[in-house]
Amino acid sequence: MVEINDIIKLYTVHPNLDLIDKNFAEDCEFEAFNIPSFKVKGIEAIHEIFKAIGFYAKDIKISKYNYTHSSHCIVLNTQQEITFNILPFVKFNYRMIINIHKNKENKITKFEEITDLESVIQNIPLANYGYFNIIKPALGYLMVKAGSYNRGFQNNGPNKIQATMERLSDNFVEKKEVNYSEPLIKLSKNFNGVTHQDKIDNMDEELFNSKKIDIKDGSNNAWKKPLNLHQ
């Protein structure tokens, strides 16, 4: 497993080359997007790259870092300090991003160094002021103006699905109580406006009245008055 501390320890004027043998694959690629940029392949060539640090640098170290990782990749964001042999009294600070690609055996198959050029410019006083206060704002202004001159761009408006859902939401009315018999009652109305429910109520009333006993002759009214079933 690749340890972050092993990578940090390589950035010194006296690197431990055993850490390279431990973490790097034999056919690993090393690519630097620096000034100058270069690319090598093979673990022996990578040995020489880290041995060369002591040739051009009096001192180098990673002062701050953070990283993200997955099963196949590590992205190491570092802040480094370096003192060159030709300028032993001047310390340069710069940012370097290191991309580490691993295989299934947790060996490094590709190692990339990407130096942030803006962090290098910050170490040069006059260039620092001119770049961050004149050149960079001017380029931002030109990009904004270029966008305003693009007449061919058309805004497609809101998303069609979103607009449809909003219309449905506006037209939706929640009905709290549902009377399931209401449609049936409406359909069963005849031309006189009488429903089957009304007929049933009338039949119940006649049946109730028919069960009353005539006090005079003791007979049941149900035999004297037939029920009207056709109203």
Curated annotation (Swiss-Prot):
What is an annotated GO biological process for this record, any one? Answer: hyperosmotic response
What does the record note about the induction of this protein?
Induced by srfA, during development. Down-regulated in grlA null-cells at 16 hours of starvation.
Question: Can you list the disulfide-bonded cysteine pairs?
Answer: none
Organism of provenance: Dictyostelium discoideum
Name by which UniProt lists this protein: SrfA-induced gene F protein
At the top level, the lineage of the source is Eukaryota
In terms of InterPro entries, this protein maps to: NTF2-like_dom_sf
